[in-house]
Amino acid sequence: MWDVFLLLVATMAALDDGVVVGVGPRGLVRLPLDRHVVITGPTRSGKTRLAKRIIKRSGLPAVVLDWHGEYSGVRLDARLLKFDVGKFDKKLLAEVVGLGLNLNEPSIYFLYRAIKSAKISTLGDVAKALDDFLVATRSEVEMKAAIIRRLEYVADVFERGKVPVEAVFKTRRVAVVDLSKLRLYEEKVLASLFVLASLYNHLANRGVSKRPNALLVVDEAQNILKRGDVVRYLFFESAKYGLRVMLVTNEMPPGDILVHSYVVMTRPHFTYTFSAKRSALIRDNKVEELWII
């Protein structure tokens, strides 16, 4: 009965006061949504379960990048999404594609040179621009061939999509992008980066917002946080447009991510820099232990 009462109180809590995530020594513990959120903890410590509760209690429309098919909502197979990459700035497109394919910095710059004057609307157009790009040295010939091979390896997955990704952003419900059907790790990373960049563009066109108006939940976030500065840029800049990114990860993110985030630790681990005996909310350099509800 007590558990039911706590859940009812948590659900009724006003968004302005934050979302209830647990009970501490001084009562209910609320997670503010004026910053991004990191949910971290070892495997099978309840990270996904907590993320689902925060989504529900916030009442905000949410887009979930679901790596393993664990979230509920309006589900959409990632293979059905259509990305209009022509709407991306060419430098951003080169970075997103390059990081998704795990290219090094010289290869990303080469990719940018190949596409900067080309008309691009699909990944197939990116491959064609590369193929048409004139090179002068043996090293450039080899670099060009290597990039095309990697791109063709994953491009066909993104050529069959029929549902514009913008339709996902316009729903007022929880939209779950199911990445579990994608076979390759690179496909999942690239799809995640495309969604993040597309959502950033979508919200930027709507203008600055002083209040949170949408959630982006990134499951297995450690897989994209390792992909370079452009991910951090999109992460940092998105907050001013009302987007709150919730990173669900079993690794403690880098310090520059933590500075912009509240951290909920579902279970302590010796590799984490924060010291706590149980689950905890870390904000403003203070660790508040709690029992998650």
What are these regions (language model features)?
Residues 2-15, 135, 167, 190, ...:
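Conserved P-loop NTPase motor module
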Residues 12-80, 224, 228, 244-248, ...:
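Glycine-rich phosphate-binding loop of nucleotide-binding enzymes
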Residues 32, 36-45, 181-277:
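Conserved P-loop NTPase motor cores
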Residues 61, 173, 214-215:
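The start of beta-strands in P-loop NTPase/AAA+ ATPase cores
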Residues 65, 177, 218-219:
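Active-site flanking residues adjacent to catalytic metal/cofactor-binding acidic residues
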Residues 73-84, 258-263, 272-281, 287-291:
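Active-site regions of enzymes building and remodeling cell-envelope glycoconjugates
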Residues 75-163, 171-174:
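Helical/strand "switch-coupling" subdomains that flank nucleotide/phosphate-binding cores, especially
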